[in-house]
């Protein structure tokens, strides 16, 4: 393990909120975009001819969602915020000490707010479209009870969430770290293609909260928030136990090559960013 290159995560609450709000805003905005686009894709697939196979529809939705996730992760803003896009991922990184307390709370709030914004925007758009008679389309997020049963759905959530976090930890802390975003996007696409018949809840608690914001948690569906949270926490233990690793470089799926990092960062890309910033400062001081 190298030295911690960024201590931004150690700022007091007020300072963190004042200085790190751009990263929080990015998380909220990107999740709103993701929910809106996936929802519109789902609506479009519902409009395919009746003989279209459900698997074909899910394939197209998954393909579009996976491409969008990859684009968000590797975008300049995505590299800045880390593109968690999921409270369970943020809390897993918080557990390994890479995210400060203030940032973890603010990220979760921003993620839920972004999902709410995306759901409301989706409903508003569908309400004014001529073909707005389809139910709110959000693959892997809507059905209150699956055909496979709630127990199976919860197990699928738990396993998939653990697989997602283990993949992120294993790849982002290896020589393959540049491929983490691509592999994550492929896994997201695969889940949207293959998992809905078993689990329509997904592995993102923020999305489930946003969809159920109308008060349907009275029937106990809030328990569906637990499997993805527990699955990703267990993935941290699996990373340490089975892969025999303790070191986590940073809390980003794709790291930026310039600018600050608000996490407790030990990533080589941050070292490069600091070196570039130092060279630029020296150049400006010489020219002054």
Q: Model-found features: residue ranges?
A:
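Membrane-interface helix-loop junctions and terminal tails of multi-pass membrane proteins
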Residues: 1-288
């Amino acid at each position: 393990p190298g030295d911690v290159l960024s201590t931004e995560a150690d700022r007091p609450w007020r300072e963190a909120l004042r200085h790190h709000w751009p990263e929080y805003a990015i998380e909220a905005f990107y999740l709103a975009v993701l929910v809106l686009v996936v929802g519109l894709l789902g609506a479009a697939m519902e409009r395919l001819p009746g003989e279209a196979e459900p698997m074909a529809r899910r394939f197209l939705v998954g393909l579009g969602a996976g491409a969008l996730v990859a684009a968000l992760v590797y975008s300049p803003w995505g590299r800045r915020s880390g593109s968690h896009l999921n409270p369970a991922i943020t809390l897993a990184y918080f557990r390994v000490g890479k995210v400060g307390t203030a940032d973890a709370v603010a990220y979760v709030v921003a993620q839920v707010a972004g999902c709410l914004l995306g759901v409301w925007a989706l409903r508003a758009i569908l309400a004014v479209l001529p073909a707005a008679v389809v139910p709110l389309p959000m693959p892997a997020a809507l059905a209150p009870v699956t055909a496979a049963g709630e127990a199976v759905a919860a197990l699928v959530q738990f396993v998939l969430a653990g697989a997602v976090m283990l993949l992120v930890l294993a790849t982002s802390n290896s020589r393959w770290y540049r491929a983490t975003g691509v592999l994550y996007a492929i896994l997201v696409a695969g889940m949207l293609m293959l998992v809905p018949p078993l689990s329509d809840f997904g592995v993102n608690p923020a999305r489930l909260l946003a969809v159920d914001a109308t008060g349907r948690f009275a029937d106990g569906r809030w328990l569906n928030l637990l499997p993805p949270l527990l699955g990703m926490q267990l993935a941290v233990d699996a990373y340490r136990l089975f892969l025999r690793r303790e070191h986590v470089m940073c809390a980003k799926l794709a790291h930026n090559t310039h600018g600050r990092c608000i996490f407790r960062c030990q990533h080589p890309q941050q070292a490069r960013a600091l070196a570039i910033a130092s060279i630029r400062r020296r150049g400006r001081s010489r020219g002054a």
